């Protein structure tokens, strides 16, 4: 792994933190980690424009009514528990069976109470099954419940051509089969569907090697390794990089896979406020000054865990500042680019390209193929000695089954498209169209008066709903208008910050986006969701420049 302090790396392992010394920096980068060519008079001339983010607070009355709604729901929940215990309530699905009385509880008391009395009321808005490719339009299986959302049954009816605003299909590559996918069919005929072995045994194919070389070339790093599962790419590789005697500094809004990997590592974990470099620097300073608890020994390693784009907030990591801090305090940086690779940057190369940074300034680049590439799995990229070390020590490499050959071919096909290696500019057009669709969609929502979170360049667009009753009404009304949306609430978000999360795609036409926006405008008035107090801006004059064909 690259040593930001200039120290040596032995067998891919990070050296003891106290032994790191100030060394020469990358020849292409200045002290703050920004490429020299992207600076004017020592200051980045574009950085301030890139960090344009909105996290408007809700009006006081909205928060008051939100907590009142939860309070009323809680009171009725206790009343229903009382009625269940006395056998008065008709639905007994929430009552513990007698033969399970001595079982260890699966959930804490509050989580259990919340699930059976609050979540179950609106459960029909989650886990909706689809029966088509998750393109810009999809088919949804209709279902109903006869026991207040504890179980569902399918009616046999299919809701056709629902506008898909929930899938992470950023570049529109998750599509029905067409002639351009013939290579996937050919790979399926030659290699079959699975490898039936691990990478350490007989599970490494030439397709895996081809994919890893292509990923490294795409990211402009020395080497890369691919894994069959994106979640496990984080949770099973972080324990191979750090352990006891190490310190992990993690953003408070990091994905569960990062949190799980950090916990499994056995390292000490400290949390810094979301995208707050002052909070991060305080933790770094204290770590260097005080060392480990009780012994005061220097930390073996200090690893900073962040994401490129945060999927619940739509915010982009403040990468130049974090790189400056990791250099200053001789720490290491691990970035999860699951939602940014392929979707952020002029050519889709993620947050390093977005900020004009040298990718070698980041010690560990992680990403998944489940979003922009229309496939599954993940990768770790960086220095060759880092990747070689993970090939030997990663739990995913040693124990997990290798990536399916057709999946690997789909990723190869997608990468070649994005990089222009297929002889066309269709990949670049998709990246550019995604950026235009994102800006258009976000600015129209702001004009309407909604509170939306995140960076104006992030294709994940959270729209704040706040009140639990409005969450259910919003999702149900949108489905009636044949628009599929994802709504999110506690525990995935803070209790009073329930939201709808829209995922913009390059495959969305302007007509589709306008249909969604028209429905949102109507829902905003009906449910009184237009909470923003900011001055509305003029509508941007953006035009639909989609030039690639969309599948039927």
UniProtKB/Swiss-Prot annotation:
It is an enzyme of class 2 (transferase). SPT complex catalytic activity is negatively regulated by ORMDL proteins, including ORMDL3, in the presence of ceramides. This mechanism allows to maintain ceramide levels at sufficient concentrations for the production of complex sphingolipids, but which prevents the accumulation of ceramides to levels that trigger apoptosis. It is a single-pass membrane protein. The chain crosses the membrane at residues 59-79. GO terms for biological process: ceramide biosynthetic process; sphingoid biosynthetic process; sphingolipid biosynthetic process; sphingosine biosynthetic process. It is found in: Endoplasmic reticulum membrane. InterPro entries: Aminotrans_II_pyridoxalP_BS, Aminotransferase_I/II_large, AON_synthase_class-II, PyrdxlP-dep_Trfase, PyrdxlP-dep_Trfase_major, PyrdxlP-dep_Trfase_small. Keywords: Acyltransferase, Endoplasmic reticulum, Lipid metabolism, Membrane, Pyridoxal phosphate, Sphingolipid metabolism, Transferase, Transmembrane, Transmembrane helix. Its main location: endoplasmic reticulum. Residues 1-29 are annotated as: Disordered. The keyword Endoplasmic reticulum applies. Its EC number is 2.3.1.50. Pathway: Lipid metabolism; sphingolipid metabolism. It catalyses: L-serine + hexadecanoyl-CoA + H(+) = 3-oxosphinganine + CO2 + CoA; dodecanoyl-CoA + L-serine + H(+) = 3-oxotetradecasphinganine + CO2 + CoA; tetradecanoyl-CoA + L-serine + H(+) = 3-oxohexadecasphinganine + CO2 + CoA; octadecanoyl-CoA + L-serine + H(+) = 3-oxoeicosasphinganine + CO2 + CoA. Belongs to the class-II pyridoxal-phosphate-dependent aminotransferase family. Component of the serine palmitoyltransferase multisubunit enzyme (SPT) that catalyzes the initial and rate-limiting step in sphingolipid biosynthesis by condensing L-serine and activated acyl-CoA (most commonly palmitoyl-CoA) to form long-chain bases. The SPT complex is composed of SPTLC1, SPTLC2 or SPTLC3 and SPTSSA or SPTSSB. Within this complex, the heterodimer consisting of SPTLC1 and SPTLC2/SPTLC3 forms the catalytic core. The composition of the serine palmitoyltransferase (SPT) complex determines the substrate preference. Component of the serine palmitoyltransferase (SPT) complex, which is composed of SPTLC1, SPTLC2 or SPTLC3 and SPTSSA or SPTSSB. The heterodimer consisting of SPTLC1 and SPTLC2/SPTLC3 forms the catalytic core of the enzyme, while SPTSSA or SPTSSB subunits determine substrate specificity. SPT also interacts with ORMDL proteins, especially ORMDL3, which negatively regulate SPT activity in the presence of ceramides. This is Serine palmitoyltransferase 3. It comes from Homo sapiens.
């Amino acid at each position: 792994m690259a040593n930001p302090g200039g120290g040596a790396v032995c067998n891919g392992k990070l050296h003891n933190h106290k032994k790191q010394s100030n060394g020469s920096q990358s020849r292409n980068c200045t002290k703050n980690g920004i490429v020299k060519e992207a600076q004017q008079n020592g200051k980045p001339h574009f950085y301030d424009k890139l960090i344009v983010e909105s996290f408007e607070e809700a009006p006081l009355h909205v928060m008051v009514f939100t907590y009142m709604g939860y309070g009323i729901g809680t009171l009725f929940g206790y009343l229903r528990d009382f009625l269940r215990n006395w056998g008065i309530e008709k639905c007994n699905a929430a009552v513990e069976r007698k033969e399970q009385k001595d079982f260890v509880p699966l959930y804490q008391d509050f989580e259990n109470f919340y699930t059976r009395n609050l979540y179950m009321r609106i459960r029909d808005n989650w886990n909706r099954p689809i029966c088509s490719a998750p393109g810009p339009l999809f088919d949804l299986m209709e279902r109903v419940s006869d026991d207040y959302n504890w179980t569902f049954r399918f009616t046999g009816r299919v809701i056709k051509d629902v506008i898909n605003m929930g899938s992470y299909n950023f570049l529109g590559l998750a599509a029905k089969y067409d002639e351009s996918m013939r290579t996937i069919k050919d790979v399926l005929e030659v290699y079959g569907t699975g490898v039936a072995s691990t990478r350490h045994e007989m599970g490494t194919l030439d397709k895996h090697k081809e994919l890893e070389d292509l990923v490294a070339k795409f990211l402009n790093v020395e080497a890369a390794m691919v894994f069959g599962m994106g979640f496990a790419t984080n949770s099973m590789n972080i324990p191979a990089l750090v352990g006891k005697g190490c310190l992990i500094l993690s953003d408070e809004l990091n994905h569960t896979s990062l949190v799980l990997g950090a916990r499994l590592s056995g390292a000490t974990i400290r949390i810094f406020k979301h995208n707050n470099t002052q909070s991060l620097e305080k933790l770094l300073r204290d770590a260097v000054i005080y060392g480990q608890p009780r012994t005061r020994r220097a930390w073996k390693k200090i690893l900073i865990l962040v994401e490129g784009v945060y999927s619940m907030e739509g915010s982009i990591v403040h990468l130049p500042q974090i790189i400056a801090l990791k250099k200053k305090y001789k720490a290491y940086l691990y970035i999860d680019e699951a939602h940014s690779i392929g979707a952020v940057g002029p050519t889709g190369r993620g947050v390093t390209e977005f900020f004009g940074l040298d990718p070698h300034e980041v010690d560990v680049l992680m990403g998944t193929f489940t979003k922009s590439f229309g496939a599954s799995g993940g990768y770790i990229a960086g220095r060759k000695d880092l990747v070689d070390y993970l090939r030997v020590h990663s739990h995913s490499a040693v124990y997990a089954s290798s990536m399916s050959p057709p999946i690997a071919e789909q990723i190869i096909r997608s990468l070649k498209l994005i990089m222009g290696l297929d002889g066309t500019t269709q990949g670049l057009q998709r990246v550019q169209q995604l950026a235009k669709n994102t800006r258009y969609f976000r600015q129209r929502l702001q004009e309407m008066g909604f509170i939306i979170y995140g960076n104006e360049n992030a294709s994940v667009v959270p729209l704040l709903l706040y009140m639990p009753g409005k969450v259910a009404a919003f999702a149900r009304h949108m489905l009636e208008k044949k628009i599929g949306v994802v709504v999110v609430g506690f525990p995935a978000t803070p209790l009073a910050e329930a939201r709808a999360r829209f995922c913009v795609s390059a495959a969305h036409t302007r007509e589709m986006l306008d249909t969604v926006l028209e429905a949102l405008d109507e829902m905003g008035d009906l449910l009184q969701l237009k909470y923003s107090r900011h001055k509305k801006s003029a509508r941007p004059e953006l035009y639909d420049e989609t030039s690639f064909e969309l599948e039927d």
